[in-house]
């Protein structure tokens, strides 16, 4: 089994939606994924697990029983979407802030593939692309106040800063932290790898920059 990160395409949107439905309470229709990918194709990425055996079992043995024929996380029989980042550029002509900036709409990694550094690498790829392709000066996002793992990633690993608390931001009434990161392209390279699998991901990320 191997894991790689590549730019998301229209062919990935059903698998991306499935990864979203499995992991997050904030869900979107397929047309919303399509809107992002068609409008800002450089800003969204997927993490792919490949090397699936002919019997449908993932050779990486992450504790999953897999069936490519019946599992919508598969793009094809050899590629399983295990995570994604959905990004966009803010383009509201009536907004007071005219500075070009991006927004992370959604980030998700399947539970059995967490703690491999995949979420951080997806984020770095998207942030780099927004900076390089769209000249984004900063990126914003929202995160649930209760989501400690995401807060650790954004605040401690990626150095986002909390700019405000938005009351009852989510449909269930939970507050959100509004966060922001000023983009510096030289700071968006992969972090030091902890093990062989992370090292492969870092190499893949560098090759896509």
Q: Model regions: which residues?
A:
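C-terminal interaction modules of eukaryotic adaptor/scaffold proteins
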Residues: 175-182
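Acetyl-CoA-dependent GNAT
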Residues: 3, 10-114, 122-134, 182-184, ...
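Conserved active-site alpha-helix within GNAT-family acetyltransferase domains
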Residues: 116, 120, 132, 145-175
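Compact beta-sheet-dominated globular domain cores
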Residues: 191-193
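Conserved hydrophobic beta-strand within the GNAT/NAT acetyltransferase core sheet
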Residues: 104, 139-143
């Amino acid at each position: 089994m191997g894991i790689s990160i590549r730019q998301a395409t229209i062919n990935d949107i059903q698998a991306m939606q499935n990864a979203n439905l499995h992991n997050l309470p904030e869900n979107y229709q397929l047309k919303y994924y399509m809107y992002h990918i068609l409008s800002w194709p450089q800003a969204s990425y997927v993490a792919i697990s490949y090397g699936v055996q002919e019997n449908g079992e993932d050779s990486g043995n992450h504790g999953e029983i897999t069936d490519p024929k019946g599992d919508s996380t598969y793009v094809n029989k050899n590629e399983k979407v295990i995570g994604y980042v959905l990004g966009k550029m803010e383009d509201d002509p009536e907004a007071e802030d005219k500075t070009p900036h991006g927004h992370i709409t959604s980030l998700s990694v399947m539970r059995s593939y967490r703690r491999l550094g995949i979420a951080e690498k997806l984020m770095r790829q998207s942030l780099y692309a927004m900076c390089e392709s769209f000249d984004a000066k900063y990126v914003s996002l929202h995160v649930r106040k209760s989501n400690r793992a995401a807060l650790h990633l954004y605040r401690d690993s990626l150095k986002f800063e909390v700019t405000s608390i938005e009351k009852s931001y989510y449909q269930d009434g939970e507050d959100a932290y509004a966060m922001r990161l000023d983009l510096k392209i030289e700071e968006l390279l992969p972090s030091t790898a902890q093990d062989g699998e992370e090292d492969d991901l870092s190499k893949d990320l560098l090759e896509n920059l």
